[in-house]
């Protein structure tokens, strides 16, 4: 059963007379029965109710099949009102006579379903995503756009056959028939007959006499009678219980003030909630069933919600308690002596009893969500049908493509997308490299709108590849700019407001027209200690205040997987660049979306501004601004150590196109440019769902990344020990708060298995290397006389020389590449583009003690291009102590291979980005500890210097050559004779960084054999 907070609908008695009905706009009187649909707020990370008069709610059209399961607050209603809601839901809501003139029950017109002839060929079927041709019969279900609820209900059209397929999900009940569709009477007689056959109404009838077999019907009747008697008894008990509770509430309202009720709760050691009705509910529950004892797991307060008692406490500062029970521990409810003067309390005697619950019913499939529709857009179109990967995306085409415009349009529409002629409306641009280089007026508009440009091959690959949309976008990208691709919002079924005109104030969650600046990557204006948020409108006239060495800017995060929230809160104290004027700017919302808002307040003085800033910070975090040791409190935000340092402009200078000043060989220049390519770093982070708006590239501190590693270690331990759900939930909340992720409107996934831990470890490994690369870009010399390439080259602290293609050295390496390409790695061939001889500063000196060790081999090590700035400047490193051992088959060490393709797979190239880098290192292996299966090595056995994971295939040892005492295993792969191993190929692991001396770096081209990889 869904928790109350997750239910789409809510019912209650109006707490005041302030709310207005979304259908008729009239006020809803206090204490009258009202119903709501819960919609995502465009202003903050949470849902809000859209209230209706009870009768108006049904007029706008809803399909509630089980009110006790689907409607929050149903069980708290008076018994008669519960029956009223049930009967109205069963009858399909309020409706008039059927359009064919009959007034029978089965012929009521269904207000939220319609039939008509398509007025144009512009509509798209929401079932198959194909066009509905003009003049064809089409059926609709009214649905709400969750991002723009003020637009009310919108018809979402289907082909009749697609509607029939999705009948149950759309809430078109078995007893409904085609003749109940609005507009049915306007169809031709022929089309009416076809629809009646496609959508017949099924009447519930008993068995015919001819169906009876050997008295089976009599047995069924007896069983049915017993079941009915049992249900009748339970229903009577539930009614009596409901009457008792409401009798207590009615009498308490007459006899006691709200202050009296609070006193009763405090005396019985119950928490006092906010709101008069909640206080009354708690007192009535205690009087009827006894005072609730604290939760056994966290000592929190248990509270009745629809189907059980839920704990409202917190197991830790990060996570709420998950305890839910129908049989909570209680003690006797005690009325204080001074309250016995109240006649009702004096004579009230309730027999001790347990609360009765209706039998649990599984929630029906949400009627408002067709299979191809999600509640809100995400950064990647993961929820669309497999054959419609571009669903809800607008595509712009520019330049001369191999297909004609009509062919391209047909291809895009077949994949679920729409063609657009405006850069401002586009999700994506398809063009050519030539057009990007030419940079014509249209392409300038695309760049200004920050729309990503991809090559035409993207259309072919997106139709066939099993890779995620985001990976394919990264692989086929042609532009150095481009925000994360957003799809158009899709709708969920919900009621219609009175007016269909959009509110001028409300932007909705995702703009369809124009470009929302917060949807694209922000340009941060850096002044002094931090970046001024551009949403403040003061980025060119003010700066962030710095006082006493502290920058008055804070970025806070809060993740609650249970509630599905992924929130941020930003706070800045801004000072005018010229005058003594001060502002407090704050913004809040959901990470990875444009849900949220902001506020700019001008303050009377600097002192007032500082005081207000500190007050807000403490209110949001529970900690004083100047507190040295931060303490996390439940439901409070946590500060992210995001450094919007002063060196952003320096990075831009160093990443501009190199001039002619560099004396480095062309191949080395290209290599350095590749290693320090900021766009590649961004792409890598986008693949990991890192939010580049809340956590710009290179801004998360190393300390925070290490803290995230520690959490993953705890997750690994919790998973392996089978820890409680609460502990897993707590660790997941902590991790996602520390490392902001962009999940769009999806709930953050739990980190509850080894695979998810391994994926996040890999993400943090890359984050650390990218942090190193970005730190190198920002730091060091600011010598404007040097070419940017030379400046970056010096930061690598590595001597890089190009190896002559015709040399014997190059021939040996090319042979090593050719011979050791494994037969199972057959998706690509490797082409050696350049070979570089490398010597890292200080590495040969560090390696010197191991130079005399026997068994030294030249082995492969592959990694992402984005990691090479860190590798060359700091060497190959072992995972930090904080990192979990999961993902490292033989523990934390440096891994090598003797088969080139085994290492090449770690380069993470793709057809759209086929160039990778791979290393050859001299590795001092000495005595090897040979293993056939995973073993988390923390310390090698005595006398061993390394680990060898034995593979089933090995380079032919007879073909190995020795160069300067180092074995080069360049033979072709042959069976090793080791069969009972879990490895296909050998792995070599050393646990001391000094045992590695990097010798060569190869630039490889991965020639993929087919686009269907």
From Swiss-Prot:
Residues that bear PolyADP-ribosyl glutamic acid: 407, 413, 435, 437, 444-445, 456, 471, 484, 488, 491, 512-513, 519
Oligomer and partners: Homodimer; PARP-type zinc-fingers from separate PARP1 molecules form a dimer module that specifically recognizes DNA strand breaks. Heterodimer; heterodimerizes with PARP2. Interacts (via the PARP catalytic domain) with HPF1. Interacts with NMNAT1. Interacts with nucleosomes; with a preference for nucleosomes containing H2A.X. Interacts with APTX. Component of a base excision repair (BER) complex, containing at least XRCC1, PARP1, PARP2, POLB and LRIG3. Interacts with SRY. The SWAP complex consists of NPM1, NCL, PARP1 and SWAP70. Interacts with TIAM2.
GO biological process, one term: decidualization
PROSITE patterns, per the entry: BRCT, PADR1, PARP_ALPHA_HD, PARP_CATALYTIC, WGR, ZF_PARP_1, ZF_PARP_2
Name this polypeptide is given: Poly [ADP-ribose] polymerase 1
Organism the protein comes from: Cricetulus griseus
Start and end residues of each stretch annotated as Automodification domain: 373-523
Modified residues (ADP-ribosylserine): 499, 503, 506, 518
Binding, Zn(2+) 2: 125, 128, 159, 162
């Amino acid at each position: 059963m869904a928790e109350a907070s997750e239910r789409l609908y809510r019912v209650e008695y109006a707490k005041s007379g302030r709310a207005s009905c979304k259908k008729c706009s009239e006020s809803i009187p206090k204490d009258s029965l009202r119903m709501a649909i819960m919609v995502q707020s465009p202003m903050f990370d949470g849902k809000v109710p859209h209230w209706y008069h009870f009768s108006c709610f049904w007029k706008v059209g809803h399909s509630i099949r089980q009110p006790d399961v689907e409607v929050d607050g149903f069980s708290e209603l008076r018994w008669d009102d519960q029956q009223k809601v049930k009967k109205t839901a069963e009858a399909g809501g309020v409706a008039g006579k059927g359009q064919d003139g009959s007034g029978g029950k089965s012929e009521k017109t269904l207000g939220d379903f319609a039939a008509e002839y398509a007025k144009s060929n512009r509509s798209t079927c929401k079932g198959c995503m194909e066009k509905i041709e003009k003049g064809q019969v089409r059926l609709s279900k009214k649905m709400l756009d969750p991002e723009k609820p003020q637009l009310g209900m919108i018809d979402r059209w289907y082909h009749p056959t697609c509607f029939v397929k999705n009948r149950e999900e759309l809430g078109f009940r078995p007893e409904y028939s085609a003749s109940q569709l609005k507009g049915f009477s306007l169809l031709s007689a022929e089309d009416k007959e076809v629809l009646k056959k496609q959508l017949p109404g099924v009447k519930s009838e008993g068995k015919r006499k001819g169906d009876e077999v050997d008295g089976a019907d009599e047995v069924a009747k007896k069983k049915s009678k017993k079941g009915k008697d049992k249900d009748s008894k339970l229903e009577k008990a539930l009614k009596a219980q409901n009457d008792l509770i409401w009798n207590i509430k009615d009498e308490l309202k007459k006899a006691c003030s709200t202050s009296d009720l609070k006193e009763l709760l405090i005396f019985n050691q119950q928490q006092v909630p906010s709101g008069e009705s909640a206080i009354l509910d708690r007192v009535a529950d205690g009087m009827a069933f006894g005072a609730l004892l604290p939760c056994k797991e966290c000592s929190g307060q248990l509270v009745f919600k629809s189907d059980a008692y839920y704990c409202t406490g917190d197991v830790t500062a990060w996570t709420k308690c998950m305890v839910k029970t129908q049989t909570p521990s209680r003690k006797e409810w005690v009325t204080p002596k001074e309250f016995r003067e109240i006649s009702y309390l004096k004579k009230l005697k309730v027999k001790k009893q347990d609360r009765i619950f209706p039998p649990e019913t599984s929630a029906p499939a949400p009627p408002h969500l067709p299979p191809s529709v999600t509640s809100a857009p995400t950064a990647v179109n993961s929820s669309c049908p497999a054959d419609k990967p571009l669903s809800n995306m607008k595509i712009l085409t520019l330049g001369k493509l191999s297909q004609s415009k009509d062919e391209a349009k047909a291809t895009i529409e077949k994949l679920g997308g729409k063609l657009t002629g405006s850069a401002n409306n586009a999700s994506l641009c398809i063009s050519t490299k030539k057009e990007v280089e030419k940079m014509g007026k249209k392409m300038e508009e695309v760049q200004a709108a920050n729309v990503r440009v991809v090559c035409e091959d993207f259309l072919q690959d997106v139709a066939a590849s099993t890779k995620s949309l985001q990976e394919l976008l990264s692989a086929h990208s042609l532009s150095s700019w481009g925000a994360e691709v957003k799809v158009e919002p899709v709708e969920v079924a919900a009621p219609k407001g009175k007016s269909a005109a959009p509110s001028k104030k409300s932007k909705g969650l995702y703009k369809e027209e124009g470009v929302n600046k917060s949807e694209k990557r922000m340009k941060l204006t850096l002044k002094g200690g931090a970046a001024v948020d551009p949403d403040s409108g003061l980025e060119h006239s003010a700066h962030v205040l710095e006082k006493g060495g502290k920058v008055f800017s804070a970025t806070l995060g809060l993740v609650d997987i249970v509630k599905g929230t992924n929130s941020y809160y930003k706070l800045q104290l801004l000072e005018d660049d010229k005058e003594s004027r001060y502002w407090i700017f704050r913004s809040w919302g959901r990470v990875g979306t444009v849900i949220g808002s902001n506020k700019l307040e001008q303050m009377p003085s600097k002192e007032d501004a500082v005081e207000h800033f500190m007050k807000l910070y403490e209110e949001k975090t529970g900690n004083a601004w100047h507190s040295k040791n931060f303490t996390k409190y439940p439901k409070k935000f946590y500060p992210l150590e995001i450094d919007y340092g002063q060196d952003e402009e320096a990075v831009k200078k160093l990443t501009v196109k190199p001039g002619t000043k560099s004396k480095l060989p062309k191949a080395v220049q290209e290599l350095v440019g590749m290693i320090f390519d900021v766009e590649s770093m961004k792409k890598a982070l986008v693949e990991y769902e890192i939010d580049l708006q809340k956590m710009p590239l290179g801004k998360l501190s190393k300390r925070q990344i290490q803290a995230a590693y520690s959490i993953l270690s705890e997750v690994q331990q919790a998973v392996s020990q089978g820890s409680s759900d609460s502990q897993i939930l707590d660790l997941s909340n902590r991790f996602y708060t520390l490392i902001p992720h962009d999940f769009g409107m999806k709930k953050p996934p739990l980190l509850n298995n080894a695979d998810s831990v391994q994926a996040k470890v890999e993400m943090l490994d890359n984050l650390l290397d990218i942090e190193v690369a970005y730190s190198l870009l920002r730091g060091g010399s600011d010598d404007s006389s040097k070419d940017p390439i030379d400046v970056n080259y010096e930061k690598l602290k590595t001597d890089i020389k190009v190896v002559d293609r015709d040399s014997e050295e190059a021939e040996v390496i090319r042979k090593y590449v050719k011979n050791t390409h494994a037969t199972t790695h057959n998706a690509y061939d490797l082409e050696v583009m350049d070979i570089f001889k490398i010597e890292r500063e200080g590495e040969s000196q560090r390696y010197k003690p191991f130079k005399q060790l026997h068994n030294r081999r030249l082995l492969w090590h592959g990694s992402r291009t984005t990691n090479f700035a860190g590798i060359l400047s700091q060497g190959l490193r072992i995972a930090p102590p904080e990192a979990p051992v999961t993902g490292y088959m033989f523990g934390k060490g440096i891994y090598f291979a003797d088969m080139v393709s085994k290492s090449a797979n770690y380069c993470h190239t793709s057809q759209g980005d086929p160039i990778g880098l791979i290393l050859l290192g001299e590795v001092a292996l000495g005595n090897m500890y040979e293993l056939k299966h995973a073993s988390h090595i923390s310390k090698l056995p005595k006398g061993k210097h390394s680990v060898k994971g034995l593979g089933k295939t090995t380079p032919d040892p007879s073909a190995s050559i020795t160069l300067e005492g180092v074995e080069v295993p360049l033979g072709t792969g042959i069976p090793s004779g080791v069969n009972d191993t879990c490895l296909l190929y050998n792995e070599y692991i050393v646990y001391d960084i000094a045992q590695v001396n990097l010798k060569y770096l190869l630039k490889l081209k991965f020639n993929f054999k087919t686009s269907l990889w």
